[in-house]
Amino acid sequence: MAKANIGKLLLTGVVGGAIALGGSAIYQSTTNQLGNANRSNTTSTKVSNVSVNVNTDVTSAIKKVSNSVVSVMNYQKQNSQSDFSSIFGGNSGSSSANDGLQLSSEGSGVIYKKSGGDAYVVTNYHVIAGNSSLDVLLSGGQKVKATVVGYDEYTDLAVLKISSDHVKDVATFADSSKLTIGEPAIAVGSPLGSQFANTATEGILSATSRQVTLTQENGQTTSINAIQTDAAINPGNSGGALINIEGQVIGITQSKITTTEDGSTSVEGLGFAIPSNDVVNIINKLETDGKISRPALGIRMVDLSQLSTNDSSQLKLPSSVTGGVVVYSVQAGLPAATAGLKAGDVITKVGDTAVTSSTDLQSALYSHNINDTVKVTYYRDGKSATANVKLSKSTSDLETNSSSSSN
């Protein structure tokens, strides 16, 4: 088999060489026959001075936002890297004189506000996760220190503060509720890090609302609403701008899908961004409070779909119940315990929203405010029941346990 392959390679080389030589011989013969007849007509090739107007709606849009898009540099202690650095931070691993720290990863950010001597930058939480120090590289090449104003792991957003001394422009946000599938979408950021800062790629909006599941550093999964685009998104684009044809920010670039869940098939053109309306809502709260308070039930849970058939049978569920969240344990003193929920209960609805997984439960729960009362539908010993749960506690009151999701 090896000899056959080598033979094919050699044959290809020989045929290719024959074609090249033949072409040379034909050219030689032709030029000799034409001889002096063509010499008097020979002219040198010149570059044509043609003026082309390259200004388009796309170039104008990029120009409007380019000065407000920055690179975010995450420094950590040597041999300490963020769990997210290999996913979307553009891991560089280069050493730095930044207080003896190492540049662990780079992402992107968007300057959206100037106030006094400060400027505010929105980026993804996973871009800054695990940092010991942060720098922001401006479009003009100046590198400035950044401090964290606040962050929210659930939505994967963070707000940084920098000096406004060298800040030229700030971005404006569009109303993401007015987006239309098929309209132009342009991603601006730092793919693979600051070496390619302010890279722009163009595509369209493929979808205006997708549920995207994220895995946090503690292993818990969350589900967020996202814009889908086929504009090229690469490692390092995280936290950058997705803009419309007017140069307004319609989303903060967050992630992309590169393969199917089982890894068997590669995919292209599946990029996601957090919608601008959601971004504005979160960053305003982060500026004020530094964190986002969300209601908590006070349970540890596991998806019904993750149970073995033997474990599922012990729950005595009707055959019509194929999805839900199994209460693994209940935290004393929190809303679920107060309302009478117990380990082994299977939650199938929160309010009017059907629950088939823990991400469904979180999405439904987080649509409510602290101190709201919500009806929870569940099954116990095969029978359906409901409980009115007053959401008097927040996620900050939860005990964490990596063996199961908490809420």
UniProtKB/Swiss-Prot annotation:
Alphabetized InterPro entries for the sequence: Chloro_Bact_Ser_Proteases, PDZ, PDZ_sf, Peptidase_S1_PA, Peptidase_S1_PA_chymotrypsin, Peptidase_S1C
Active site: 126, 156, 238
Membrane disposition: Single-pass membrane protein
One GO CC annotation: plasma membrane
Compartment list: Cell membrane
Record-listed substrate binding positions: 236-238, 297-301
Transmembrane regions listed in the UniProt entry: 6-26
Record field: catalytic activity: Acts on substrates that are at least partially unfolded. The cleavage site P1 residue is normally between a pair of hydrophobic residues, such as Val-|-Val
GO BP terms in the entry: proteolysis
Keyword Chloroplast recorded: no
Disruption phenotype annotation: Inactivation leads to reduce the efficiency of secretion of the recombinant protein produced, although the protein produced is completely stabilized.
Domain PDZ residues, every copy: 301-382
UniProt keyword Transmembrane helix, yes or no: yes
GO molecular function: serine-type endopeptidase activity
Family designation: Belongs to the peptidase S1C family.
Protein name: Serine protease Do-like HtrA
Species of the source: Lactococcus lactis subsp. cremoris (strain MG1363)
